[in-house]
Amino acid sequence: MLYFFGNSRFFLFFFYFFFYFVLVIKSSVGKNEYVSPDELNIKTSGFLGYKCDFSTEGIHNLEPDIVERRSVICSINSYFIYDKIKLIIPKQDDPKSKFKLLPENCFAKVYSDIEGKTEIPIEQTGLIEYTLEENDTNQDYSERIIQISPFNNKDIEFYCICDNTEQVISHIDGRSALVHVTVLKYPHKIVSVNLTDQKYPYLFDAYNKNDFINYKLEIGLKEGELLVLACKQIDNKCFQKNDESKNGDLYKTNKIIYHKDFAIFKAPIYVKSNNATAECKCKIDEANIYTLVVKPDYDEKVIYGCNFSKDLSFRTFTNNMNLLKYNENTNINCNVEISQPFYDHLIGISCPGTIIPDCFFQIYKPLTNELKSSEITYLDSQLNIGNIEYYEDIHGNNEIRIFSIVGAIPQSASFTCMCKMDKITGFMNIKIGSAYYAFLSKLFIIFIPLFFMWL
């Protein structure tokens, strides 16, 4: 009897162990979960794009200012990959508000020619694949949002006007503002793969199922090129994972956009190695699952920034300042200044210690005076753009942070990041100029009063 129970206990133990082992193996191997690109967009996307914030507390607010009476310009000059422009305006149903938006239903209608005061529906501008949205849930302001695709075949320009010039406080007038949007034609090649039955007239020379060999297709991309996959059901890590047969890898912060039936991959400006890949699976049905592998080109671009390490083997930095050469309790300043009307740059820091703050997502605003500490803010809000790509790397004992900007920035900006190693601190002070918008704003200051006199 004891022998039987002893064997029974052994048998039960073996059974439970085997059952647990099978569950672990099954869960680790598991099947891919497939979702629509739109579902994945809801799970992964925040706000990507640009803001013109004319609300009372906004960066472009038009409240009366005795010191600063100039008109305000909010300019956007960029290509778009389903990025958004968010126009934030005071509630217009407030009887005390003198704020006017022209045209009233901007962005549904816009000015195509500010000099001719030509008001047209947005569909007549030539935009391809865009969406409009309004959000009135906030009690203090409303939001007008336009989301723009990369498929325009020409540069497109349009305007809206925000007017708060009536006398709102005694004899002091409020201010006016120009919203100036230039949607650039996407500057790089767009490669498309259509695995749906739908025709998209703006996807030219698209690959299809016949181009796959054994359900697999690999496509090489040059820097900045887009790959647009049209598919109804994609795996839930689409383009976020590597081709497992290769050692290279890409970064989680690459530009990957999910929109309607599209999964879009932008070849990054910074690639870690020459065998980096990313893949996406498209499920037609249980028997037909296609794997698309993208392989970005590898190019060693110069990094505008500061290498505080003695190691010069990782890429080329414009400034090299080895912290180990300095005495303790020393602060080292590394200054980097760039001024271009159009950017295609990598900006970065290499640090053998700790990078402070969480650069480049977070950065220090420049010091306003010696008695006040720098404030921490977000890089996209400091530059007032949303089209930024962030990269991280480790090389030996050095932590490397990099970001890239492509296009123009609305206004010049400065910020600081720190590299702290024991009792030595390196300060990277970055200044990014905006030559184009400095010239444009001067024209606007002269022109906008004439415009309102003419209205």
Swiss-Prot record:
Pfam families: s48_45. It comes from the Eukaryota. Keywords: Cell membrane, Disulfide bond, Glycoprotein, GPI-anchor, Lipoprotein, Malaria, Membrane, Repeat, Signal. A lipid is attached at residue 433 (GPI-anchor amidated glycine). Disruption phenotype: Male gametes fail to attach at fertile female gametes. Residues 1-30 form the signal peptide. It is a lipid-anchor; GPI-anchor. It is found in: Cell surface; Cell membrane. GO terms for cellular component: cell surface; plasma membrane; side of membrane. Disulfide bonds join 52-74, 106-160, 306-334, 351-419, 359-417. This is Gametocyte surface protein P45/48.
